[in-house]
């Protein structure tokens, strides 16, 4: 359940034959329009993010701070039908608005996530396109990078503890992979990419599903490391997770 947030503002807009809306953090942005979500409008202040995901993301040097712009893109078989259009089910169920509000709720619960700044959708007929703008985390490296560079020295225990903390709050992260777990040089961790995420009553089934998803991604991204080495590292992560879960944090 995502609670009401009085600092959230809403602005309708039109573009061509479509119509949509922008939700934004009015403590960070005085106003918002569609240009926020166009990398072309940022010119040389926007540059593509080249690691992880399906593309469609840019680092943006904005007046309100260094940010990340992400356009929602489909993968797999669905991308053959449309790369960037989703079936309209109502404004509150758009991918962008749902993720924006979920991230704000996680921040209220004192969890380490990037601060969302604005989200939009543009509806045309039965479909819509969407985008999200959020603050950029500085000087961080993904668990995927740590695993490639440090192997056994990567922050496996810290990762398990971090995931347990989010699970204790009820976050079901359907795309928990090694690119979506970040650490800075001081060992502080964050989770990112909450598309299709949801808050649930903590239960073993969905928690284990998240962890299995992470395990598969570690095996996929192992590079020259053996599957046996990856499994041993994952066991360290899982043990730390279970200990943290048992302690209640």
Swiss-Prot record:
Topological category with respect to the lipid bilayer: Peripheral membrane protein
Keywords attached to this entry: ATP-binding, Cell inner membrane, Cell membrane, Kinase, Lipopolysaccharide biosynthesis, Membrane, Nucleotide-binding, Transferase
Pathway annotation from the record: Bacterial outer membrane biogenesis; LPS core biosynthesis
Broad enzyme group: transferase
Known catalytic reactions: an alpha-Kdo-(2->6)-lipid IVA + ATP = a 4-O-phospho-alpha-Kdo-(2->6)-lipid IVA + ADP + H(+)
Subcellular location: Cell inner membrane
Biological-process GO terms, alphabetical: lipopolysaccharide core region biosynthetic process
Keyword Hydrolase: no
Molecular function, one GO term: kinase activity
Active site: 175
Disulphide-bridged cysteine pairs: none
The keyword Lipid metabolism belongs to this UniProt entry's keyword annotation: no
GO cellular component, one term: plasma membrane
EC numbers on record: 2.7.1.166
Similarity section: Belongs to the protein kinase superfamily. KdkA/RfaP family.
Functional description taken from the UniProt entry: Catalyzes the ATP-dependent phosphorylation of the 3-deoxy-D-manno-octulosonic acid (Kdo) residue in Kdo-lipid IV(A) at the 4-OH position.
Name of this protein: 3-deoxy-D-manno-octulosonic acid kinase
């Amino acid at each position: 359940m995502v609670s009401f947030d009085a600092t959230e503002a809403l602005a309708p807009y039109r573009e061509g034959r479509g119509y949509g809306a922008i939700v934004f953090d009015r403590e960070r942005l005085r106003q918002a329009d569609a240009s926020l979500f166009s990398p072309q409008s940022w010119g040389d202040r926007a540059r593509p993010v080249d690691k992880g995901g399906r593309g469609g993301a840019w680092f943006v040097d904005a007046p309100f701070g260094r940010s990340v712009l992400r356009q929602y893109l489909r993968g797999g078989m669905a991308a053959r039908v449309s790369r960037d259009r989703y079936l309209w089910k109502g404004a509150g169920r758009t991918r962008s608005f749902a993720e924006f509000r979920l991230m704000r709720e996680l921040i209220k619960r004192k969890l380490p996530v990037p601060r969302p700044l604005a989200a939009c959708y543009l509806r045309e007929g039965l479909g819509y396109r969407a985008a999200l703008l959020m603050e950029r985390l500085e000087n961080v490296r993904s668990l995927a990078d740590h695993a490639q560079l440090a192997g056994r020295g990567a922050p496996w225990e810290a990762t398990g503890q971090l995931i347990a903390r989010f699970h204790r709050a009820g976050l079901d992260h359907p795309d928990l992979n090694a690119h979506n777990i970040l650490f800075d040089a001081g060992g502080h961790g964050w989770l990112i990419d909450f598309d299709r995420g949801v808050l649930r009553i903590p239960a073993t089934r969905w928690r284990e599903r998240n962890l299995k998803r992470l395990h598969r991604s570690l095996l996929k991204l192992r590079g020259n490391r053996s599957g046996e080495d990856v499994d041993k590292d994952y066991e360290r992560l899982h043990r730390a997770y279970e200990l943290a879960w048992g302690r209640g944090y």
